[in-house]
C-alpha cells in the first residue's frame, strides 16, 4: 500500500479522530488548525453509542472515564422551572451496559489530541 500524505483541515474532534485512523492505516495525515492552541470550552457531551465503539477500538475508554463528570440525576423541568421528573444516571448507565460518560467537548478533544502521534 502506498503511504499517502493527507491534509486535514481542523484540529477538532473529527480532525484528530481521522488523523488517528489514517496514521493507523499507514498514511501520513497532516492536521492544520486556525487556532494557536486547542480550543477550550464547549458543551457537555453525553458520550455513548457509535462514538463509544470508536473510542473502544482506539483504546481510549480509560482516558474517557478519567475525564467523566458524574451527575446524580437528569432533571426535566417545565417553563416555570418546576421539576417534572428525574432519572438517575446509574439507571441510564446500566441501560447502556456501562458504555456512557458525560464530559466536556474540550476534554474529549484533548483525549483525541493526545492519542494522535505528535509527528502528525
Task: Cite the ranges covered by each PLM segment.
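Conserved N-terminal helical subregion
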Residues: 2-6, 23-25, 48, 52-120
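Conserved N-terminal Rossmann-fold NAD(P)-binding element of oxidoreductases
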Residues: 9-10
Amino acid at each position: 500500500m502506498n503511504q499517502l500524505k493527507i491534509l486535514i483541515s481542523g484540529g477538532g474532534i473529527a480532525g484528530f479522530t481521522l488523523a488517528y485512523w489514517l496514521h493507523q492505516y499507514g498514511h501520513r495525515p497532516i492536521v492544520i488548525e486556525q487556532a494557536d492552541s486547542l480550543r477550550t470550552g464547549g458543551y457537555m457531551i453525553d458520550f455513548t453509542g457509535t462514538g463509544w465503539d470508536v473510542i473502544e477500538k482506539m483504546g481510549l475508554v480509560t482516558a474517557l472515564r478519567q475525564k467523566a463528570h458524574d451527575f446524580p440525576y437528569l432533571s426535566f423541568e417545565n417553563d416555570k422551572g418546576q421539576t417534572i421528573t428525574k432519572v438517575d444516571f446509574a439507571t441510564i448507565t446500566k441501560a447502556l451496559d456501562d458504555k456512557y460518560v458525560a464530559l466536556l467537548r474540550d476534554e474529549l478533544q484533548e483525549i483525541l489530541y493526545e492519542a494522535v502521534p505528535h509527528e502528525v
